[in-house]
Amino acid sequence: IVERCHLNRNTFYYHFQDIPNLAEYTVKSWADQIIQNNYEFGSPMTCLVPLIEECNQHKKAFQHLYNSSQKDEFITYMNHVALHIVKMFMKQSSHYVLRSEQEKETLIHFYKCLMIGILIDWLEAQGDYDLKPFVEQIFHLIETTIQAH
């Protein structure tokens, strides 16, 4: 990395602890940019569609990280990124403003776990199914189940 970017090691380690820290920073920056470019969130699905499209575009990079010797670190920082994304969504979504703090925390935890579970399943399947229709179906099932009760 330092050779390719024409940096010395001290400069790199001044900004980042290690390569997983750099990867987490990169993915968070990438997610923030997607969120900012798609600011108007109506539902969790409208938040996730741009992220899903980006995951599909960067499938090989995600698979490489997931299948690497640093799989545990990758999953850990994806948990951090998913939590970050869900919290950003919650802060910007008017649908959740009136919820109690406990309800917000529960919803944040639920959506984070849902995102990570879907991502890990997709990576385990080597990305051989299209994430977008799969996630759309999940949210449709969630909505219709909630409306039925």
Language-model-detected regions and their locations in the chain:
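A short secondary-structure junction motif
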Residues: T26-Q33, H58, F62, H84-S93, ...
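An amphipathic alpha-helix adjacent to DNA-recognition modules
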Residues: E3-H6, Y13-Y39, V49
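Basic/polar phosphate-binding segments, predominantly the helix-turn-helix DNA-binding elements
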Residues: I1-N21, E54-Q57, A61-L65, S69-H84, ...
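Cytosolic nucleotide-binding catalytic cores of signal-transduction proteins
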Residues: R4, R99, T106, E124, ...
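Secondary-structure edge/capping motif, primarily at the C-terminal ends of alpha-helices
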Residues: N38, F62-Y66, S93-Y96, W122-Q126, ...
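Hydrophobic alpha-helical connector segments
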Residues: Q36-A61
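Amphipathic alpha-helical packing segments from all-alpha helical-bundle domains
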Residues: P50, K71-Y96, Q102-G117, Q147
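C-terminal peripheral helix-coil segments that are non-catalytic and often amphipathic
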Residues: C113, D121-H149
